Amino acid sequence: MKLIKNGISSKDESGEVILRPEEPEDMWHTYNLITPGDELKANTYRKVVSTSATGSTKSEKRKISLTLRVQEIDFDPKEGSIRVKGVNVVENKFVKIGASHTIELEPHRNFTLIKSCWDTIFMERLKLSCDVSKKADLAAIILQPGLAHLCLITSHMTVTRAKIEKSIP
C-alpha cells in the first residue's frame, strides 16, 4: 500500500490519510482500517438525471467525489474489492447531504480515510501495510486426485490464484 499523505495530528491523534492500495493484501489491510463512523472520501460513479426545458429527461453516469460517513463495509477477497456503504456528509452538485451511497474501493485508486482517533492498533496496521519489507510471499500448491489449488500465502491472508481440475479415469 502506498501512503500518499499523512495528516494525522500528533496532539489528539485525529486526522486523515490518503492511501493507494496496490495489491490484494492491501485491500485486506484497507478493510481492517475502515470502521463504521469513519469518513471515507473517494471517486465514484453516480447516475445523474437532468430535465430539459421541454420536460424530457436524460440520465448519464458521472464521476464524482463523495465523502461518506461509513455505516457498513463488505470485503470480497476473490475480486479484491471493498464496498463501503454510508451517508454523504459533504454536499456537492449532484448528491445532497444525508443521501445514501455505496463506494467501491479497488486497487490502484486513491482514497482518503478520516478518523476522529487513530489508536495504536490502527497506526500499527497502517505502518505494517505500507512497509514493503513485511510482504514476503510464499506459493503453495495443494493437491488431491483431479484437483489442485495454487495459493499465495502472505503474513495476513491466503489468496487462491488458480484452481485446476482434471478428470482422472
Predicted regions and their residues:
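Extended, charged alpha/beta regions that create polyanion-binding interfaces
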Residues: M1-H149, I153-P169
